[in-house]
Amino acid sequence: MRCMNTPPPAPSSLHPPRRSAWSRLCRICALGWLLAACALQQGVSAAPSASSVPGTAQTFGPLISAQALATLPTQVRIIDLRDDAAAANVAHIPGALAAPYADWRGPSSNPGQLLPLPRFTALVRRLGLNTETPVVLVASGDDPSDFGAPARVYWTLKWLGLKHLAILNGGMTAWQAAALPLTRQPTPAPTPSAFTPQLDDALLATRSEVARDLGHPSTLLLDARPKAFYLGREKAPAASRPGTLPGALDFDNLHWFEPGSGALPAVSTLQRIAAQLPQQPGAVQIVSFCNTGHWAATNWFVLSEVLHRPHVALYPGSMVDWSRADAPMAHVPTRWQQLEQTWQAL
């Protein structure tokens, strides 16, 4: 609510009654409180939505540069998601804890499937995290597809209830390019936490919810895959059929990146790119999906966390989950076309 100046009430006579000094002082104090409240409210509405580091004046996220990460206090928990992060003698950021991306994913037959909640809880507790722990997620940063790993884990942790999250933009590639310190010494295991999940299901789109919203103009189903997957010319190995969700529109997650770069560009650039999003009249919610919720996590992260688009959810199982359920699909090639595609791939 904005504060608005109101004219003083009209005097009841040509010469209004004189007020005591105490009365005038009370009115001045009341006016001061009102102006302070207005300024506070306006300041809150204009404040950036970065996460804070509890106990300090520093803020970070949802993206953080290598240089900024190097200045943060040691209480910030750095999670290394690289496949070889847990291997012996692997160079890493000092203080980083190894939790390879595969630890956060489903089985190879359906990688996008959410783990059972007790497994997520045990993993978060092992890393010593709770809902107030500031967390920075680090991947290799080699290419745009790699960004899906920290984006998916960021989404997972936010869904589980963690509040202070950031991704190292450009990952280890950016850290090494900045000539920042590395170590091969293993990080001591933290004291396990007593973390209890506080699920935010507004971030999650389940298969049944997607099925319910098919054809509904208020929900934009956004396919984050390359065009060939969207058109049914290619399919993920774990998917039972090629194609996409009925009524879906496509926006390849690669659009957010400069060619060959694993780091997101400036917010102003992302805003210009977002202006190219496909439009669906009446849509108030976006459901981001791909093959296994990996590329889709990048679209979700940029739209929801960086550009602050409201009502963006992720379908974690995506097309692998959907196609195996024998649910309706669009752009499904004929059997002959599928055989031809298989032959050409040999």
Label the model's feature ranges:
Residues 6-30:
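Bacterial N-terminal signal peptides that target proteins for export
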Residues 26-41:
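Bacterial N-terminal signal peptides
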Residues 38-51:
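Signal peptide processing junction and immediate N-terminal pro/mature segment
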Residues 53-65, 71, 105, 173-246, ...:
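Active-site neighborhoods of enzymes that stabilize oxyanions during catalysis
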Residues 54-132, 140-145, 213-283:
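Positively charged, proline/Ser/Thr-rich regional signature most characteristic
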